[in-house]
A protein has these predicted regions:
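Short acidic, glycine/serine/threonine-rich loops at helix termini
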Residues: 74-76, 104-106, 115, 125-127, ...
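Acidic beta-strand-loop-alpha-helix segment within the catalytic core
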Residues: 112, 118-194
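N-terminal subdomain of lithium-sensitive/metallo-dependent phosphomonoesterases centered on the IMPase/IPPase/PAP
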Residues: 1-92, 151-154, 158, 199-200
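General beta-strand structural signal in soluble alpha/beta enzymes
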Residues: 62-66, 91-93, 102-104, 123-124, ...
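Solvent-exposed alpha-helices and their adjacent loops that cap or buttress functional pockets
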Residues: 54-55, 80-86, 94, 102-106, ...
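DPxDG-like acidic metal-binding loop motif
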Residues: 86-97, 101-121
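Gly/Ser/Thr-rich active-site loops/lids in small-molecule metabolic enzymes
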Residues: 189, 195-199, 212-214, 219, ...
């Protein structure tokens, strides 16, 4: 999932408006921090994000959102949003990536919005999960999602001028990752398990001096697209590969 086409950058004033959008969603969700109800967290964030997005100077269409139109009252896929200005964009939203974390009073949740020129953002909704690898910009020439785990970690460590034993790999704590965790530890790397929030973890893996060097494993496709958008802005490398759950996908 590495974009090759050049894209016209989003105007700076619109980018600043998006800060207000995520700020509103985060503040609304924070009212339910530690209250134990992730649905309240999500509902508050969705409502606040939708309200502020409606005032942004753009003609937007939601391509990644809260679900199909019959599944979500707001921020559904295909919803038109913004004040109808001339800037035509695709929008990806996740009002809170980490609703369970927020409900439990834990860190790691993030509110995310990504914009790109109309017709340039794609999310293959028929495939729910993607396998992804994220690392910092120094590893951009060595990341290969098809390489064996041990070889991959060795190459990333060399690019970062570290030993494999000094690498910290963040992985979602899921049964499907047992082999990945075993192979990573077998290669000598440390594992940091997270219960949720792989968008924030992807950003950490791409930035220096965060205590995280690599993110690996299978997560949601929408989160993969949002992570890719963030890493396109901040630098780093991300590779994604569809992970179909069955023959239908």
């Amino acid at each position: 999932m590495e974009a090759k086409r050049s894209r016209r950058p989003i105007e700076r004033n619109v980018a600043m408006e998006l800060v207000r959008v995520t700020e509103a969603a985060a503040l609304a969700a924070a009212r339910f921090l530690g209250m134990g109800d992730k649905n309240q967290v999500d509902a508050a964030a969705v409502s606040a994000m939708r309200f502020v997005l409606g005032k942004v100077h753009m003609d937007g269409i939601v391509v990644i959102g809260e679900g199909e139109k019959d599944e979500a009252p707001m921020l559904y896929i295909g919803e038109k949003i913004g004040d109808g200005s001339s800037l035509r964009v695709d929008i990806a939203v996740d009002p809170v990536d980490g609703t369970t974390l927020t409900a439990k009073g834990l860190p790691g949740a993030i509110s995310a919005v990504a914009l790109s020129a109309r017709g340039t953002m794609n999310c293959p909704r028929q495939v729910v999960y993607v396998n992804k690898i994220v690392a910092g910009r120094e590893a951009k020439d060595v990341v290969d999602i098809n390489a064996p785990v041990a070889e991959h970690l060795k190459n990333i460590a060399r690019a970062k001028r570290m030993k494999v034993s000094e690498l910290t790999v963040v992985v979602l704590d899921r049964p499907r990752h047992e082999q990945l965790i075993s192979e990573s530890r077998g290669a000598g790397a440390r594992i940091k398990l997270i219960s949720d929030g792989d968008v924030a973890a992807s950003i950490q893996a791409a930035l220096p001096e965060t205590g995280v060097d690599v993110l690996m494993g299978i997560g949601g496709t929408p989160e993969g697209v949002l992570s890719a958008a963030a890493i396109r802005c901040i630098g780093g490398v991300i590779q994604c590969k569809a992970w179909p759950r069955d023959d239908k996908e």
